[in-house]
From Swiss-Prot:
Its main location: nucleus. Monomer. Interacts with ATN1; the interaction represses the transcription. Brain specific. Present in all brain sections tested, highest levels in the caudate nucleus and hippocampus, weakest levels in the thalamus. A zinc finger (NR C4-type) spans 16-36, 52-78. InterPro entries: NHR-like_dom_sf, Nucl_hrmn_rcpt_lig-bd, Nuclear_hormone_rcpt_NR2, Nuclear_hrmn_rcpt, Znf_hrmn_rcpt, Znf_NHR/GATA. It comes from Homo sapiens. One of its GO terms (biological process) is negative regulation of astrocyte differentiation. This is Nuclear receptor subfamily 2 group E member 1. The lineage of its organism: Eukaryota, Metazoa, Chordata, Craniata, Vertebrata. Orphan receptor that binds DNA as a monomer to hormone response elements (HRE) containing an extended core motif half-site sequence 5'-AAGGTCA-3' in which the 5' flanking nucleotides participate in determining receptor specificity. May be required to pattern anterior brain differentiation. Involved in the regulation of retinal development and essential for vision. During retinogenesis, regulates PTEN-Cyclin D expression via binding to the promoter region of PTEN and suppressing its activity. May be involved in retinoic acid receptor (RAR) regulation in retinal cells. It is found in: Nucleus. CDD domains: NR_DBD_TLX, NR_LBD_Tlx_PNR_like. GO terms for cellular component: chromatin; nucleoplasm.
Length: 385
Protein backbone atom coordinates (compact mmCIF):
# COMPACT_ATOMS: atom_id res chain seq x y z
CA UNK A 1 0.00 0.00 0.00
CA UNK A 2 1.45 3.40 -0.93
CA UNK A 3 2.12 5.91 1.79
CA UNK A 4 0.43 9.31 1.89
CA UNK A 5 2.60 12.08 0.56
CA UNK A 6 2.93 13.59 4.02
CA UNK A 7 4.35 10.45 5.56
CA UNK A 8 6.96 9.63 2.95
CA UNK A 9 10.46 9.09 4.23
CA UNK A 10 11.86 11.32 1.49
CA UNK A 11 12.61 14.87 2.66
CA UNK A 12 11.34 16.44 -0.53
CA UNK A 13 11.91 20.12 0.35
CA UNK A 14 15.50 19.93 1.61
CA UNK A 15 18.24 19.62 -1.03
CA UNK A 16 21.32 17.47 -0.75
CA UNK A 17 24.18 19.59 0.61
CA UNK A 18 26.59 17.91 -1.79
CA UNK A 19 24.89 17.87 -5.19
CA UNK A 20 21.60 19.74 -4.72
CA UNK A 21 19.41 16.72 -5.54
CA UNK A 22 16.50 15.89 -3.24
CA UNK A 23 17.71 14.80 0.17
CA UNK A 24 16.45 11.63 1.83
CA UNK A 25 17.18 12.89 5.33
CA UNK A 26 20.32 13.38 7.39
CA UNK A 27 23.27 11.14 6.61
CA UNK A 28 26.52 11.45 8.56
CA UNK A 29 25.42 14.78 10.00
CA UNK A 30 24.12 16.59 6.91
CA UNK A 31 21.12 16.44 4.62
CA UNK A 32 22.11 14.34 1.63
CA UNK A 33 20.64 12.21 -1.14
CA UNK A 34 21.01 8.42 -1.18
CA UNK A 35 23.59 8.62 -3.97
CA UNK A 36 25.98 11.01 -2.20
CA UNK A 37 25.59 9.38 1.22
CA UNK A 38 26.27 5.95 -0.29
CA UNK A 39 29.29 7.28 -2.19
CA UNK A 40 30.66 8.87 1.00
CA UNK A 41 30.16 5.68 3.00
CA UNK A 42 31.91 3.49 0.42
CA UNK A 43 34.78 5.96 0.04
CA UNK A 44 35.45 6.21 3.77
CA UNK A 45 34.99 2.52 4.56
CA UNK A 46 37.30 1.47 1.76
CA UNK A 47 39.76 4.27 2.54
CA UNK A 48 39.69 5.43 -1.07
CA UNK A 49 42.01 8.13 -2.43
CA UNK A 50 40.85 9.67 -5.69
CA UNK A 51 42.66 11.79 -8.26
CA UNK A 52 40.86 14.75 -9.78
CA UNK A 53 40.11 14.10 -13.45
CA UNK A 54 40.82 17.70 -14.45
CA UNK A 55 43.89 18.07 -12.23
CA UNK A 56 42.21 20.97 -10.47
CA UNK A 57 41.35 19.48 -7.08
CA UNK A 58 37.92 20.74 -6.07
CA UNK A 59 37.34 22.59 -9.33
CA UNK A 60 35.00 20.10 -11.01
CA UNK A 61 31.24 20.75 -10.80
CA UNK A 62 29.45 18.57 -8.27
CA UNK A 63 25.75 18.78 -8.99
CA UNK A 64 22.92 16.40 -9.83
CA UNK A 65 24.10 16.10 -13.44
CA UNK A 66 27.86 15.95 -12.95
CA UNK A 67 28.26 14.33 -9.52
CA UNK A 68 29.51 11.03 -10.96
CA UNK A 69 32.16 12.55 -13.23
CA UNK A 70 34.90 13.24 -10.65
CA UNK A 71 35.07 11.20 -7.47
CA UNK A 72 37.88 13.30 -6.00
CA UNK A 73 35.88 16.52 -6.17
CA UNK A 74 32.72 14.78 -4.99
CA UNK A 75 34.47 13.44 -1.88
CA UNK A 76 36.06 16.85 -1.26
CA UNK A 77 32.60 18.43 -1.43
CA UNK A 78 31.26 15.83 1.03
CA UNK A 79 33.97 16.80 3.49
CA UNK A 80 33.48 20.52 2.86
CA UNK A 81 29.81 20.30 3.86
CA UNK A 82 30.94 18.52 7.05
CA UNK A 83 29.93 14.93 6.43
CA UNK A 84 31.24 13.06 9.47
CA UNK A 85 33.86 10.40 8.70
CA UNK A 86 33.72 9.07 12.24
CA UNK A 87 30.01 8.34 11.87
CA UNK A 88 30.84 5.99 8.99
CA UNK A 89 33.64 4.22 10.83
CA UNK A 90 31.50 3.65 13.93
CA UNK A 91 28.48 2.41 12.01
CA UNK A 92 27.90 -1.21 13.00
CA UNK A 93 26.72 -3.74 10.49
CA UNK A 94 24.23 -6.44 11.47
CA UNK A 95 25.64 -9.16 13.72
CA UNK A 96 23.88 -11.83 11.73
CA UNK A 97 23.23 -11.11 8.10
CA UNK A 98 22.02 -13.43 5.40
CA UNK A 99 21.37 -12.71 1.76
CA UNK A 100 17.80 -13.88 2.20
CA UNK A 101 17.09 -11.36 4.98
CA UNK A 102 18.68 -8.50 3.09
CA UNK A 103 16.82 -9.32 -0.08
CA UNK A 104 13.59 -9.26 1.92
CA UNK A 105 14.46 -5.85 3.32
CA UNK A 106 15.25 -4.58 -0.15
CA UNK A 107 11.80 -5.34 -1.42
CA UNK A 108 10.12 -3.61 1.50
CA UNK A 109 11.42 -0.33 0.12
CA UNK A 110 8.85 1.93 -1.53
CA UNK A 111 8.95 3.57 -4.93
CA UNK A 112 10.36 7.05 -5.00
CA UNK A 113 7.85 9.86 -5.51
CA UNK A 114 7.13 11.07 -9.04
CA UNK A 115 8.80 8.05 -10.59
CA UNK A 116 12.30 9.24 -9.75
CA UNK A 117 13.26 5.72 -8.76
CA UNK A 118 12.29 4.25 -12.11
CA UNK A 119 15.79 3.86 -13.44
CA UNK A 120 14.80 2.56 -16.81
CA UNK A 121 12.48 4.07 -19.42
CA UNK A 122 8.93 2.87 -19.68
CA UNK A 123 6.80 2.30 -22.75
CA UNK A 124 3.17 1.70 -23.56
CA UNK A 125 3.08 -1.71 -25.15
CA UNK A 126 0.37 -3.07 -27.40
CA UNK A 127 0.77 -6.75 -26.55
CA UNK A 128 -1.51 -9.77 -26.13
CA UNK A 129 -2.72 -10.75 -22.66
CA UNK A 130 -0.03 -13.42 -22.46
CA UNK A 131 2.60 -10.70 -22.25
CA UNK A 132 0.68 -7.90 -20.56
CA UNK A 133 2.18 -8.47 -17.13
CA UNK A 134 5.59 -9.09 -18.65
CA UNK A 135 5.81 -5.80 -20.48
CA UNK A 136 4.17 -3.78 -17.74
CA UNK A 137 6.79 -4.97 -15.29
CA UNK A 138 9.73 -3.63 -17.28
CA UNK A 139 9.73 -0.02 -15.98
CA UNK A 140 9.58 -0.94 -12.27
CA UNK A 141 12.18 0.86 -10.19
CA UNK A 142 12.61 -0.32 -6.62
CA UNK A 143 14.04 1.77 -3.84
CA UNK A 144 16.45 0.24 -1.39
CA UNK A 145 15.30 0.12 2.21
CA UNK A 146 17.75 0.92 4.99
CA UNK A 147 20.04 -2.10 4.92
CA UNK A 148 23.37 -1.90 6.71
CA UNK A 149 26.23 -4.01 5.45
CA UNK A 150 29.64 -4.81 6.84
CA UNK A 151 32.48 -2.76 5.38
CA UNK A 152 34.31 -5.91 4.38
CA UNK A 153 31.61 -7.25 2.12
CA UNK A 154 28.99 -5.23 0.28
CA UNK A 155 26.10 -7.43 -0.76
CA UNK A 156 24.18 -7.46 -3.98
CA UNK A 157 21.32 -5.73 -2.22
CA UNK A 158 23.43 -2.90 -0.89
CA UNK A 159 24.54 -2.06 -4.42
CA UNK A 160 21.04 -1.99 -5.85
CA UNK A 161 20.48 1.57 -4.69
CA UNK A 162 18.72 4.23 -6.75
CA UNK A 163 21.08 6.09 -9.06
CA UNK A 164 20.34 8.28 -12.07
CA UNK A 165 19.58 6.76 -15.44
CA UNK A 166 22.54 6.27 -17.74
CA UNK A 167 22.46 9.37 -19.93
CA UNK A 168 24.21 8.48 -23.15
CA UNK A 169 25.88 11.88 -23.26
CA UNK A 170 26.25 14.94 -21.08
CA UNK A 171 27.39 18.02 -22.98
CA UNK A 172 28.60 15.72 -25.73
CA UNK A 173 30.74 13.59 -23.40
CA UNK A 174 29.87 9.90 -22.84
CA UNK A 175 28.85 9.32 -19.23
CA UNK A 176 30.33 5.87 -18.99
CA UNK A 177 33.83 7.08 -18.39
CA UNK A 178 36.21 4.83 -16.51
CA UNK A 179 35.53 5.94 -12.92
CA UNK A 180 31.80 6.39 -13.44
CA UNK A 181 31.29 2.99 -15.01
CA UNK A 182 33.42 1.10 -12.52
CA UNK A 183 31.06 2.02 -9.69
CA UNK A 184 27.84 1.99 -11.68
CA UNK A 185 28.25 -1.34 -13.48
CA UNK A 186 27.98 -3.34 -10.24
CA UNK A 187 24.89 -1.41 -9.21
CA UNK A 188 23.26 -1.91 -12.61
CA UNK A 189 24.14 -5.61 -12.62
CA UNK A 190 22.47 -6.01 -9.24
CA UNK A 191 19.32 -4.32 -10.52
CA UNK A 192 19.25 -6.46 -13.64
CA UNK A 193 19.33 -9.62 -11.56
CA UNK A 194 16.50 -8.39 -9.32
CA UNK A 195 14.47 -7.30 -12.35
CA UNK A 196 14.89 -10.71 -13.98
CA UNK A 197 13.55 -12.47 -10.90
CA UNK A 198 10.64 -10.09 -10.44
CA UNK A 199 9.89 -10.30 -14.15
CA UNK A 200 9.73 -14.10 -14.07
CA UNK A 201 7.44 -14.13 -11.03
CA UNK A 202 5.07 -11.73 -12.79
CA UNK A 203 4.61 -13.78 -15.96
CA UNK A 204 1.18 -15.42 -15.49
CA UNK A 205 2.05 -18.48 -17.58
CA UNK A 206 5.31 -18.96 -15.68
CA UNK A 207 3.57 -19.06 -12.32
CA UNK A 208 1.23 -21.84 -13.47
CA UNK A 209 4.17 -24.26 -13.64
CA UNK A 210 5.39 -26.25 -10.66
CA UNK A 211 7.89 -24.49 -8.41
CA UNK A 212 10.53 -27.03 -9.40
CA UNK A 213 10.03 -26.24 -13.09
CA UNK A 214 10.03 -22.50 -12.42
CA UNK A 215 13.34 -22.66 -10.57
CA UNK A 216 14.95 -24.91 -13.18
CA UNK A 217 13.90 -22.55 -15.97
CA UNK A 218 15.16 -19.49 -14.12
CA UNK A 219 18.47 -21.12 -13.19
CA UNK A 220 19.03 -22.07 -16.82
CA UNK A 221 17.91 -18.77 -18.36
CA UNK A 222 19.32 -16.15 -15.98
CA UNK A 223 22.46 -15.68 -18.08
CA UNK A 224 20.46 -14.93 -21.24
CA UNK A 225 18.06 -12.67 -19.35
CA UNK A 226 21.03 -10.80 -17.92
CA UNK A 227 22.68 -10.27 -21.32
CA UNK A 228 19.36 -9.17 -22.82
CA UNK A 229 19.08 -6.69 -19.98
CA UNK A 230 22.53 -5.30 -20.74
CA UNK A 231 21.50 -4.80 -24.36
CA UNK A 232 18.11 -3.32 -23.47
CA UNK A 233 19.30 -0.81 -20.88
CA UNK A 234 22.55 0.21 -22.61
CA UNK A 235 24.82 -0.78 -19.73
CA UNK A 236 28.48 -0.17 -20.66
CA UNK A 237 30.51 -3.27 -21.47
CA UNK A 238 33.91 -1.71 -22.05
CA UNK A 239 36.53 -4.42 -21.47
CA UNK A 240 38.88 -2.26 -19.38
CA UNK A 241 36.01 -1.14 -17.17
CA UNK A 242 34.70 -4.66 -16.62
CA UNK A 243 38.16 -5.93 -15.75
CA UNK A 244 38.53 -3.04 -13.30
CA UNK A 245 35.17 -3.93 -11.79
CA UNK A 246 36.27 -7.54 -11.31
CA UNK A 247 39.67 -6.55 -9.94
CA UNK A 248 41.41 -9.01 -12.24
CA UNK A 249 44.70 -8.24 -13.95
CA UNK A 250 47.86 -9.95 -15.11
CA UNK A 251 49.40 -9.75 -11.66
CA UNK A 252 46.67 -11.55 -9.72
CA UNK A 253 45.01 -13.79 -12.30
CA UNK A 254 46.24 -16.82 -14.23
CA UNK A 255 46.92 -15.78 -17.83
CA UNK A 256 44.81 -18.58 -19.31
CA UNK A 257 41.83 -17.62 -17.16
CA UNK A 258 42.31 -13.92 -17.89
CA UNK A 259 42.50 -14.51 -21.65
CA UNK A 260 39.32 -16.60 -21.51
CA UNK A 261 37.47 -13.85 -19.67
CA UNK A 262 38.74 -11.15 -22.04
CA UNK A 263 37.63 -13.27 -25.00
CA UNK A 264 34.16 -13.71 -23.52
CA UNK A 265 33.87 -10.00 -22.73
CA UNK A 266 34.61 -9.34 -26.40
CA UNK A 267 31.89 -11.84 -27.35
CA UNK A 268 29.52 -10.01 -24.99
CA UNK A 269 30.37 -6.70 -26.65
CA UNK A 270 29.65 -8.17 -30.06
CA UNK A 271 26.27 -9.64 -29.19
CA UNK A 272 25.18 -6.48 -27.37
CA UNK A 273 26.23 -4.39 -30.37
CA UNK A 274 24.19 -6.60 -32.70
CA UNK A 275 21.08 -6.18 -30.56
CA UNK A 276 21.55 -2.43 -30.38
CA UNK A 277 21.97 -2.21 -34.16
CA UNK A 278 18.50 -3.71 -34.58
CA UNK A 279 17.05 -1.19 -32.08
CA UNK A 280 14.59 -3.57 -30.44
CA UNK A 281 11.57 -2.13 -28.68
CA UNK A 282 10.30 -3.20 -25.25
CA UNK A 283 7.74 -5.66 -26.64
CA UNK A 284 10.39 -7.46 -28.68
CA UNK A 285 12.63 -7.72 -25.64
CA UNK A 286 9.73 -9.09 -23.58
CA UNK A 287 8.99 -11.75 -26.18
CA UNK A 288 12.65 -12.75 -26.45
CA UNK A 289 12.84 -13.09 -22.67
CA UNK A 290 9.95 -15.52 -22.78
CA UNK A 291 11.51 -17.45 -25.64
CA UNK A 292 14.83 -17.92 -23.80
CA UNK A 293 13.07 -18.72 -20.52
CA UNK A 294 10.63 -21.36 -21.76
CA UNK A 295 13.13 -23.99 -22.90
CA UNK A 296 11.86 -27.51 -22.21
CA UNK A 297 15.30 -29.07 -22.41
CA UNK A 298 16.63 -31.28 -19.59
CA UNK A 299 19.29 -29.45 -17.59
CA UNK A 300 22.30 -30.57 -15.60
CA UNK A 301 22.82 -29.82 -11.92
CA UNK A 302 26.37 -30.96 -11.36
CA UNK A 303 26.42 -34.51 -12.70
CA UNK A 304 22.66 -34.93 -12.30
CA UNK A 305 20.37 -34.68 -15.33
CA UNK A 306 17.14 -32.97 -14.33
CA UNK A 307 13.93 -33.22 -16.34
CA UNK A 308 10.93 -30.91 -16.22
CA UNK A 309 7.66 -32.10 -14.76
CA UNK A 310 5.62 -30.42 -17.49
CA UNK A 311 7.88 -30.16 -20.51
CA UNK A 312 4.92 -30.12 -22.92
CA UNK A 313 3.43 -27.02 -21.31
CA UNK A 314 6.81 -25.27 -21.34
CA UNK A 315 7.33 -26.06 -25.02
CA UNK A 316 3.84 -24.75 -25.81
CA UNK A 317 4.59 -21.50 -24.00
CA UNK A 318 7.77 -21.02 -26.01
CA UNK A 319 5.81 -21.65 -29.22
CA UNK A 320 3.28 -19.04 -28.16
CA UNK A 321 6.04 -16.56 -27.41
CA UNK A 322 7.53 -17.06 -30.88
CA UNK A 323 4.14 -16.74 -32.57
CA UNK A 324 3.43 -13.56 -30.64
CA UNK A 325 6.79 -12.06 -31.61
CA UNK A 326 6.30 -12.99 -35.26
CA UNK A 327 2.81 -11.47 -35.34
CA UNK A 328 3.97 -8.32 -33.57
CA UNK A 329 6.90 -7.77 -35.95
CA UNK A 330 4.67 -8.39 -38.98
CA UNK A 331 2.33 -5.64 -37.78
CA UNK A 332 4.84 -3.21 -36.28
CA UNK A 333 7.63 -3.56 -38.84
CA UNK A 334 5.94 -4.53 -42.13
CA UNK A 335 8.91 -3.29 -44.19
CA UNK A 336 11.35 -5.62 -42.38
CA UNK A 337 10.31 -9.16 -43.41
CA UNK A 338 13.60 -10.65 -42.16
CA UNK A 339 13.48 -9.02 -38.72
CA UNK A 340 11.89 -11.99 -36.93
CA UNK A 341 14.51 -14.39 -38.26
CA UNK A 342 17.35 -12.01 -37.38
CA UNK A 343 16.19 -11.80 -33.78
CA UNK A 344 15.88 -15.57 -33.39
CA UNK A 345 19.33 -16.08 -34.90
CA UNK A 346 20.79 -13.77 -32.26
CA UNK A 347 19.54 -15.86 -29.33
CA UNK A 348 22.30 -18.55 -29.38
CA UNK A 349 24.88 -15.76 -29.07
CA UNK A 350 23.44 -14.89 -25.64
CA UNK A 351 25.17 -18.03 -24.36
CA UNK A 352 28.58 -17.04 -25.76
CA UNK A 353 29.56 -15.70 -22.35
CA UNK A 354 29.63 -18.37 -19.65
CA UNK A 355 27.74 -18.03 -16.35
CA UNK A 356 31.05 -18.30 -14.49
CA UNK A 357 32.46 -15.30 -16.34
CA UNK A 358 29.36 -13.22 -15.63
CA UNK A 359 29.61 -14.12 -11.96
CA UNK A 360 33.35 -13.37 -11.89
CA UNK A 361 33.08 -10.03 -13.69
CA UNK A 362 29.79 -8.59 -12.46
CA UNK A 363 29.08 -10.21 -9.09
CA UNK A 364 32.19 -11.67 -7.44
CA UNK A 365 32.98 -8.46 -5.57
CA UNK A 366 29.44 -8.07 -4.30
CA UNK A 367 28.41 -11.59 -3.29
CA UNK A 368 31.74 -13.35 -2.97
CA UNK A 369 31.62 -17.08 -3.68
CA UNK A 370 27.85 -17.47 -3.29
CA UNK A 371 26.62 -19.25 -6.46
CA UNK A 372 24.21 -17.13 -8.48
CA UNK A 373 21.88 -20.11 -8.89
CA UNK A 374 21.54 -20.45 -5.13
CA UNK A 375 20.91 -16.74 -4.78
CA UNK A 376 18.29 -16.86 -7.54
CA UNK A 377 16.47 -19.74 -5.89
CA UNK A 378 16.54 -18.04 -2.49
CA UNK A 379 15.25 -14.74 -3.83
CA UNK A 380 12.62 -16.33 -6.04
CA UNK A 381 11.14 -18.22 -3.10
CA UNK A 382 10.98 -15.05 -1.03
CA UNK A 383 7.43 -13.76 -0.62
CA UNK A 384 8.79 -10.21 -0.55
CA UNK A 385 9.58 -10.22 -4.27
Amino acid sequence: MSKPAGSTSRILDIPCKVCGDRSSGKHYGVYACDGCSGFFKRSIRRNRTYVCKSGNQGGCPVDKTHRNQCRACRLKKCLEVNMNKDAVQHERGPRTSTIRKQVALYFRGHKEENGAAAHFPSAALPAPAFFTAVTQLEPHGLELAAVSTTPERQTLVSLAQPTPKYPHEVNGTPMYLYEVATESVCESAARLLFMSIKWAKSVPAFSTLSLQDQLMLLEDAWRELFVLGIAQWAIPVDANTLLAVSGMNGDNTDSQKLNKIISEIQALQEVVARFRQLRLDATEFACLKCIVTFKAVPTHSGSELRSFRNAAAIAALQDEAQLTLNSYIHTRYPTQPCRFGKLLLLLPALRSISPSTIEEVFFKKTIGNVPITRLLSDMYKSSDI
